[in-house]
Regions:
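Short amphipathic alpha-helices and their capping/turn segments at secondary-structure boundaries
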Residues: 22-36, 153-162
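CN hydrolase (nitrilase-like) catalytic-core segments centered on the catalytic cysteine
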Residues: 62-80, 146-240
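Extreme N-terminal starter segment of soluble prokaryotic enzymes
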Residues: 1-7
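Cys-nucleophile CN-hydrolase/nitrilase-fold catalytic domain and related Cys-dependent amidase chemistry
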Residues: 17, 26-101, 105-107, 173-194, ...
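Short beta-strand scaffold segments in enzyme catalytic cores
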Residues: 81-83, 94-98, 132, 221-223, ...
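Active-site catalytic loop in hydrolytic enzyme cores
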Residues: 62-65, 87-165, 169-191, 255-261
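A short C-terminal boundary segment appended to hydrolase-like catalytic domains
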Residues: 249-282
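Short polar catalytic/cofactor-binding loops
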Residues: 9-15
Length: 282
């Protein structure tokens, strides 16, 4: 079915969960007033990104008052939100929730934690162990968190699991100059476009803005059609409220015109990956 999605390109305050929750609620109210069906927030929207030793201080259990409040807000609009999750055994995850009709439809824990260059996630966080598609009012979705999308297998697994829409939550820093754009922006635009085109799927990409410890996050949130075309894209380096009309007909047309997923041979892929795993284990 057709639906309207909002990409909430915000600038979270580092370590300030209460302030961020208030700002997030304001964006949700604005999206509901605009008659949107879904709102997508960036990675770690509730806490900010470069947390380091603050991780245990900002972590939330899924039954915390803050999460329960967001669940209640989802009775009027579907919500995707990034936060630091504390598990029952006191592990901390970079997680994302998909909330709909007053329930948690899906919880994704970031699998690939970057620990190079600017990034140090593995020092403070545990990694997730699965990629699973899930059903929503708007079809079958899959969620990825930033670095997850740079691993081809992640998007492929979700597509093979039936996802026709991929949501990627991101906290991508601005790096490099590429003509009139940023190198990091150009790289992400190529990645999201190629993923959508090869997997005949839609991509909703929500990236944050603002500064933390002198690092600037670049924004540029966008909706990419199954053809790989960017339908709408947010501003660079400043907050934005991007509204995207997601057309089911475009998905149907692209899958008829270029049936990549129909012709994908999952069993050959599994067979060859198993062969490689066996050979490496010798």
């Amino acid at each position: 079915m057709d639906f309207t999605a909002v990409l909430a390109q915000i600038k979270p305050k580092l370590g300030c969960v209460a302030d961020n929750l208030a700002a997030i609620e304001g964006q949700i109210i604005k999206a509901r007033e605009a008659k949107a069906d879904l709102i997508v927030f960036p990675e770690l929207a509730l806490s900010g990104y470069f947390l380091k030793d603050l991780v245990p201080e900002v972590a939330l259990r899924i039954d915390s008052p803050e999460i329960l409040h967001l669940i209640e807000l989802s009775r009027g609009i579907s919500i995707t939100i990034g936060f630091v999750e504390e598990s029952d055994d006191y592990h901390f995850f970079n997680s994302a929730l998909y909330l709909e009709d007053g329930i948690i439809r899906h919880l994704h824990r970031k699998v690939y934690l970057p620990t190079y260059g600017l990034f140090d996630e593995q020092r403070y966080l545990a990694h997730g162990e699965s990629f699973r598609a899930f059903d929503t009012k708007f079809g079958r979705f899959g969620m990825l968190i930033c670095e997850d999308m740079w691993h081809l297998s992640a998007s492929y697994i979700l597509a093979m699991d039936g996802a026709t829409t991929l949501i990627c939550l991101s906290s991508s820093p601005a790096r490099g100059i590429d003509g009139d754009s940023l190198g990091s922006a150009a790289a992400w635009q190529k990645l999201t476009s190629t993923t959508a085109m090869f997997l005949n799927c839609r991509v909703l990409y929500s990236n944050r803005v603002g500064f933390e410890d002198g690092v600037n996050f670049w924004g540029g949130s966008e909706y990419i059609a199954p053809s790989g075309e960017s339908v709408v894209r947010g501003a660079l380096l400043e907050e934005d409220f991007i509204t995207a009309r997601v057309d089911e007909g475009a998905l149907r047309r692209e899958r008829i015109f270029s049936p990549m997923i129909r012709d994908e041979n999952l069993f050959v892929t599994m067979q060859e990956l198993q062969r490689i795993a066996n050979e490496r284990g010798r």
